[in-house]
Amino acid sequence: MASSMISSGTVATVSADRPAPAQARMVAPFNGLKSSSAFPVTRKSNDITSIASNGGRVQCMQVWPPLGLKKFETLSYLPPLSSESLAKEVDYLLRKNWVPCLEFELETGFVYRENHRSPGYYDGRYWTMWKLPMFGCTDSSQVLKELEEAKKAYPQSFIRIIGFDNVRQVQCISFIAYKPAGF
């Protein structure tokens, strides 16, 4: 702000004696792209029924029912996955070079907060690992075989399949593969 206090005559003599400082050579600020008249514009309706692709038979979209159904994890809104669907999911994580692993929970497979009180994705549950992660697994049938063994050993447990990226050292996918009767 000192530059605004000096007189204009002083500025003229300073600029005549030496080159102008970098501040005097500032470029005008960026004002954005060219006017929008050069670009074609389409106006879209905000009507949600225009998004539906079922011939307009839908007036509104149904959400998860709040009563009687517990929220589990990824894919929990779908009906129980068949062996073929599970094999496709496992094939996907194998194609991504993730390491499959099975975990089980004997009491509650749904989301709740016990050991962790802050909001967010992680809810503080601890699942028990079924054997070791399946490093070197190349076929989804190997994972499904382990899933069947886990079901026989713990028929009243929730069993999930996770995909672990051992390069980034993060869990990339997790979904419930088996729920006990009554869930």
Curated annotation (Swiss-Prot):
Annotated keywords: Calvin cycle, Carbon dioxide fixation, Chloroplast, Photorespiration, Photosynthesis, Plastid, Transit peptide
Signal peptide location: none
Primary site of residence: plastid
Keyword Cytoplasm listed: no
Keyword Cell cycle: no
InterPro entries, per database record: RuBisCO_ssu (IPR024681), RuBisCO_ssu_dom (IPR000894), RuBisCO_ssu_N (IPR024680), RuBisCO_ssu_sf (IPR036385)
Role: RuBisCO catalyzes two reactions: the carboxylation of D-ribulose 1,5-bisphosphate, the primary event in carbon dioxide fixation, as well as the oxidative fragmentation of the pentose substrate. Both reactions occur simultaneously and in competition at the same active site. Although the small subunit is not catalytic it is essential for maximal activity.
Subunit field text: Heterohexadecamer of 8 large and 8 small subunits.
Family per record: Belongs to the RuBisCO small chain family.
Additional detail: The basic functional RuBisCO is composed of a large chain homodimer in a 'head-to-tail' conformation. In form I RuBisCO this homodimer is arranged in a barrel-like tetramer with the small subunits forming a tetrameric 'cap' on each end of the 'barrel'.
Protein name in UniProt: Ribulose bisphosphate carboxylase small subunit, chloroplastic
Organism name: Pyrus pyrifolia
Gene name of this polypeptide: RBCS
